[in-house]
Structure formats: structure tokens, C-alpha cells
Amino acid sequence: MSSKKSSLAALTLGAIGVVYGDIGTSVLYAIKEVFGSGHVPFTPGNIYGILSIFFWTLTVIVSIKYVVLVLRADNNGEGGLIAMLALASTAVKDKPKLRRILLIVGVFGTSLFYGDGVITPAISVLSAVEGLEVVSPAFKEGVIPITLVILFCLFALQKHGTAGIGRYFGPITLIWFVVIALLGISQIVTNPAILKAISPHYALLFMWHNPGTTFIILGAVVLCVTGAEALYADLGHFGKRPIRLAWFSVVMPSLVLNYFGQGALLLNNPAAVKNPFYLMAPEWALLPLVGLATMATVIASQAMITGAFSVTKQAVQMGYLPRLNIQHTSVKDTGQIYITFVNWSLFVAIVLAVVMFRSSSNLAAAYGIAVTLDMLITTTLTFFVIRYSWNYPLSLCIAATGVFFLVDLAFFASNLMKLFAGGWFPLLIGGAVFTLMMTWKEGRGLLNDKLRSDAIDLPSFLDAVFVSPPARVEGTAVFLTAEPGTVPNAMLHNLKHNKVLHQQNLFVTVRYHEVPWIGMNKRLEIESLGHDCWQVTVHYGFKNDLDLPKALQQIKGRGCELESMTTSYFLSRDTVVPTIGRGMASWREKLFAQMHHNASGAADFLNLPNNSVVELGSKIEI
């Protein structure tokens, strides 16, 4: 029992560090943006109303929607938009039109994650460093350079992995939550009546008397739920119970105390609106608080970067992105990965965001549209999971998700007002990623259709070949083929140029499925084709690590003896040639051809030994 408790405590501490870093640092800027906008006069009724809106936003969106409802929609224990997309699309596989719509919506939501992934580290680190301006105005000119240096160091460290320092994320973030709670309490004791704002009637009164202002400030209120998606995205790492326990026991109480403390400070000193978070602290504590805030925002940014790597890997394995060079940075933890292209693309985009917007207040204008649209998409997919995967009655599905849909829609509509003030930036990034993902998916479909139409039936081909068999050489040849039962181009080229066949020949097709994990007991299917030839199908989930040589070891004892020293892997390196008048638009075909050209080779992707790989090229028109 004690070991279970210690395991739960460790997972809960880990969840505090990874899952809640982003939402935990929103106290740095959320209240400041609502009152600093000038839309809300400093009256006790308005301050009570805003705090009440904050409290009930956290309660409805995070506590009820994500912690209670969405966490239930796991895909074999995994969470995140891709996992939910796989769950929803599988549930409606007998409705092809609806399935395609859901796939497009889900892919768009996944694309928006990258836009969010640019804004979050930029606004978090920048808002922490801006605390130096409270220490001394002389630091103002150094805020952006210091922010850029911190971000560069963060991204430069990624290739070395974070397993070593990752164990400190939970304790540091826990200290952060304790500190922000104490800061809030220090102000609440000066005006305990501020706690009355927990009552929803203050929020309702404010909205009733200020409908126009309410609509406008929702664009800033949404900042208090930044990172809510992480609760679901990190489900597979920690599990439901630790995530829920961390939220209700530590995170939400600390956030509420801090927000209410900032409200109490503003009641006593409206001038503190320039930076209410830091001005809650005594002067002697400012520099240590800036240091702690910077560490907390770096941890929050790290969680976002790690999430970007994980989402990219899943998208690659589900066929929405080309193969990328994925490096494992930890021997013990297979989830610790590094993708060079994603890392430095994110860094460049974040630097652009910091340099273009120059302050956390300006970045707050860019934040919101992508996040609220993502929340809308999550609610929509949740509806289809409840309806078609859980088979609940339609009325219950509407009741369960309808309120959340309306709340998300209100936040999204409010944030649309920030479109030209900066909201376009994450949308532009998300739109670009969406274009790449859909172009790759459709391009691969066209390419596979072309390969299928030109394919030669493998059993018939082998029968013809062995009428007058070529010379056999020792060892095993592994030919990769997109479709089982078809002759791979690499084999045709090998016979044409080398005029030999190996003693054993494996025709291997790798299948990716819309489930997170497929166990080793279901990894392999093997079928004898005669003449010491076998058709092998290897199955992977979208979170499995790919290692084809390891998977093929299961063949031993099933009629084929595989020795790594005498095994050669024959791959076809196809060059895509765009043509006019078929398939996609011309510019998309050219884009797909370029993506295909730049894709990482199958050898690296499938972890094949470099000294055993033979690549043979061919051209394919689409």
C-alpha cells in the first residue's frame, strides 16, 4: 500500500511540473491584461466581478470540462488531440464523409498546437523577465536580450535531453505554486472580503451590467486557462488520478489564491495594475521571485517543446507528416526524443514573436484565437467520441458538451477581435502546418494509388521467376513494400541489375494504426510464399518506437532463420515527379515532391543498420 502511495505521490509531483507549468505561470500576466486594457474601471464591484469570472472560468473549463469529462475520453490510456482524433475517426469509420470532416477538423486542431507552441514560451519567459523592470527601470532595455538568451540556451540544450534535469521540474514547480499561494494570502489578509468573489452572482452581475465589456475582456480572461490542453495531452505520461489530484489539491487552490490576492492589491492600490503579480511581493523578494518565475516559465516552455516533439512523432506515424530524423535522448525513457527540424523551427518562430511583439502585453493580443479554437475542436471531437464510441443517447451527448461548446464559442468570438492585433500570427503558423499536413496526407494517397495501379502481383511474379530461377546467394534480403502481396520496386531493380536472389527473402509491409500502442505479441504477421520467401506485416501504434530489426527477430523459429550479420535491407528511394492535370493543384504537387525529397530515409526511421542497407532509386509521376 505504501509503495502505491509513494508512486501516486511521485506521479502527482511529476504532473505538477510537466502538466501544469503553463497554466501555473499565467498568473504573471492574466490579471494585468484584463485591467491594464483600460476597458474595466477600478471599482470594487468590477474587481469582484472579474475575479468571479476568473474563478468560474477555471472551474467550468478546467475542473469540469477537462479534469472530469475530457480525461475520460482516453485512447487506450493515451490523451491529446491526435489520440482523440484517432478515437473519434475510428468510431465513425462506417460514415466516410463524417470521418473525413472529423479528420480535417482534428488535423487543423493539431496544427494550431504549433501556433500555441510559439506564443507560450515567448509570453511566459518574457513576462517573467519583465519583473526586472519592477526591480529597476534601468533593466527595461535588457528584457528582450535576456529573454532571447534564455530561449536560445533552452533550445540548444534539447539535443542533450532533459532526463537529467527533468527530475527537478516537479519540485521547482511545486515551490512556485506554494510561493504564488503565499503571495496571494499576504494580500488577501489585508482585505478578506475579496473571497466573496467566489460567488457566481458577482460574475453574473458584472456580465449583466457590462455585456459589451464582458465580451471584450473574455479575450484576456482566457489567459487564465492557458495550458489547459496539457491536462489531456499528458494523460499517457501520468494517468488520470495524479493529474486530477494535482489540480484539486495544489494547482487550482494556488491559482485562485494568487488571482484573488492580485484583486485585493488592486482594491488597495489601483496603480499596481502595471504589474500586480510582482508588486504583491516585498521589495527584498523581487529578484529571487524573478529568478523563480524564470525557472517556472522555462519549465512550462520545456513541456511545450517536449509536447511538440511528441505530437510530431505521432503525426509522422499516422501519415500526416513526412519521416523526420527522430533521436532518442534517453536510454531508459523512450518518450525522451529530439527532432532537430522541429526544435530550430520553433526557436526561429519564437524569436520572431519576441522581436515583433516586444512585450508580454503585446503577445497577449496574439494569444487566444488558436487556443480557443483548439478548445472548440476538443469539445467537438469529445461529442463524437461520447456519441459513437461510448454509444450514449444523443440528448445526453448534447447535454454533456453543449454548455462547454457555447462557453468555448464565446471565448473564441471574443478573441477574434484580436485578429489584427496579433492573433493572425499563431493562426498563420497553424495554417501553414495544416497545409503541409494535408498536402502530405493527400500526396501520399496519390502516390500509393499510383504504386497500387502499377503493382505486380507478388505470388504470380515469384511463380514466373522460379520457372527459370536466378542464382541464389547466401543470406537474407528484406524488401520493404507499401502494399502486401505486391512486388517492391527494389526487388525488380535488384533482379534487373544484379540478377541474383538471396537464399531467404522477406517482403515486409509496415502498418501504422490509429491506436497508441500495439504490443509485441501482436507486432508481426508472417505468411509463407514458398521458395524460401515470406510476406511479413509489421504493426505499430502511433506512440510505438519503430525498430524493424528488433521486430523481425520474432520470425526466428517460424520457418525462417534471421541472422543480423547476413541480412540486407533493400529500399526503394522514389523520386516524385509532379504532372499537370491530375491529383492536387500544381503548387501542392510541387510542395509534396519537395517534402518527399527532404523526408528522412526509411533506414533511419525504422532503425535499420547503416552497413546493411541498399537503396535503389526510381521515378514516379503523380
UniProtKB/Swiss-Prot annotation:
It is a multi-pass membrane protein. The chain crosses the membrane at residues 8-28, 50-70, 101-121, 137-157, 169-189, 203-223, 247-267, 279-299, 337-357, 366-386, 393-413, 419-439. InterPro entries: K+_transporter (IPR003855), K_trans_C (IPR053952), K_trans_N (IPR053951), Kup (IPR023051). One of its GO terms (molecular function) is symporter activity. It catalyses: K(+)(in) + H(+)(in) = K(+)(out) + H(+)(out). HAMAP family: Kup (MF_01522). This is Probable potassium transport system protein Kup 2. It comes from Polaromonas sp. (strain JS666 / ATCC BAA-500). The lineage of its organism: Bacteria, Pseudomonadati, Pseudomonadota, Betaproteobacteria, Burkholderiales.
